[in-house]
Amino acid sequence: MYWTFAFFTLLMIAVLLLSRFPQVQHTTEERAGSLEMYRALARKRVVWMYFFAMFAYVGCEQGTADWISQFLSQYHGFDPHTTGATAVSWFWGLLTAGCFLGLLLLKIFDSRKVLIGASFGALFCLSAALFGPASVSVIAFPAIGLFASVMWPIVISLALNSVAEHHGSFSGILSTAIIGGALVPVIIGRVGDRIGLRGGLACLYLTFGCILTIGFWAKPLINNTTLNLKKASAEAAT
């Protein structure tokens, strides 16, 4: 399997080296910007709030995926190489598939409402996974991925839509927040060593809760465009 990945990696490198791409002229908003731009952004409270929100989201994603197999093995006796691995695969699969459902929901509802609903759904699944029986836990863990799938794009869009300038620099700051994916799983493990893995994974209540709050305090400059279903129904009737 690793040889297959290595082959395709080398193939992609070769294609990129042989391809000719047009030269892109970045606008002022798209450029990374000067040190002064970053200082200006660092003085904005909303920038830090979204930075920690992105930190929390990536922590949720990796913190869940990294410990699913161990939890199912430790508390329910599932084989980590079969059932555990399958649960992790389903988590990532639903995390991907849920993006398509998110596209539909964002055409109907305000992005903040979608984020609130997804956060509550993820918290419910987390509770079922941590405290439910084996038959529920093995399903609830992957289901977290379905609800988490819409969080990344919504948080990113709300963040960039909350500042009027320096979007390129702000994007760089948000990208730095992916360090949460490296730190949160370690925190879960450290807490788990002291009070048990269930207690460690309970840290995800804090990170998912952080995402939930965005739906209440976010104030985007422009709201996402949604379909007016009542108007569409009236027009169809006439």
For each feature predicted by the language model, list its residue ranges.
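Intracellular juxtamembrane helix-capping segments at the cytosolic ends
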Residues: 149-164
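Extracytoplasmic gate region of multi-pass secondary transporters
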Residues: 41-90
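C-terminal membrane-cytosol helix-exit motif in multi-pass small-molecule transporters
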Residues: 3-28, 212-219
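Short hydrophobic/small-residue motifs within alpha-helical transmembrane segments
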Residues: 54, 91-97, 178-180
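A membrane-interface helix-boundary motif in multi-pass transporters
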Residues: 1-6, 187-208
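Structural signature of the two symmetry-related core transmembrane helices
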Residues: 113-128, 202
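Helix-to-loop junctions at the C-terminal end of transmembrane segments
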Residues: 97-110, 192-193
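Juxtamembrane intracellular "pre-TM" segments in multi-pass secondary transporters
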Residues: 24-50
